[in-house]
C-alpha cells in the first residue's frame, strides 16, 4: 500500500514538473473566452496518438478566492466516440501559467464536448486532421 502511494506521488510530482517546465515556453493560441476566463491551447503539444492530447491554459480574468490566477491542463480526446476528458492539471498563482503551483487538478472522466463551448473548441483542435 505504501509503495503504491509512493509511486502515485512520484508520478504526480513528475507530471507537475513536466507540465510546468514544458509549458513555460509554450506558444499559446487563444481559442475562447467567457466572462471569467481566457482559454489558450499550445498546438505544438498536440500529439497524433489514437487518443490525441493537448496542453491548455486557463487564465482567470480576476484571481480566484484562493489567489490562483491561471491553470495548466492536459486534455485528451476520443475522436471516434466524440468524447473529451481533462487528464490532469495544476493551479498557479500568477497569470499565463507562471508562479507557484498551488494545487493539483484530477481527471473528471469522459464528457460530451458539446456540454461546454470551450470543450467543443478543444475537441475540434484535437480531432481535426493537420
Predicted regions and their residues:
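N-terminal secretory-pathway/extracellular module detecting exported/lumenal segments
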Residues: 22-130
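Bacterial N-terminal signal peptides that target proteins for export
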Residues: 1-11
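Bacterial N-terminal signal peptides
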Residues: 9-21
Amino acid at each position: 500500500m505504501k509503495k503504491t502511494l509512493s509511486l502515485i506521488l512520484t508520478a504526480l510530482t513528475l507530471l507537475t514538473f513536466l507540465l510546468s517546465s514544458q509549458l513555460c515556453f509554450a506558444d499559446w493560441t487563444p481559442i475562447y473566452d467567457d466572462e471569467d476566463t481566457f482559454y489558450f491551447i499550445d498546438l505544438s503539444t498536440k500529439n497524433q496518438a489514437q487518443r490525441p492530447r493537448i496542453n491548455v491554459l486557463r487564465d482567470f480574468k480576476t484571481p480566484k478566492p484562493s489567489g490562483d490566477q491561471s491553470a495548466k491542463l492536459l486534455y485528451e480526446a476520443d475522436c471516434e466516440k466524440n468524447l473529451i476528458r481533462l487528464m490532469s492539471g495544476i493551479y498557479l498563482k500568477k497569470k499565463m501559467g507562471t508562479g507557484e503551483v498551488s494545487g493539483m487538478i484530477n481527471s473528471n472522466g469522459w464528457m460530451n464536448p458539446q456540454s461546454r463551448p470551450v470543450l467543443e473548441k478543444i475537441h475540434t483542435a484535437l480531432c481535426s486532421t493537420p
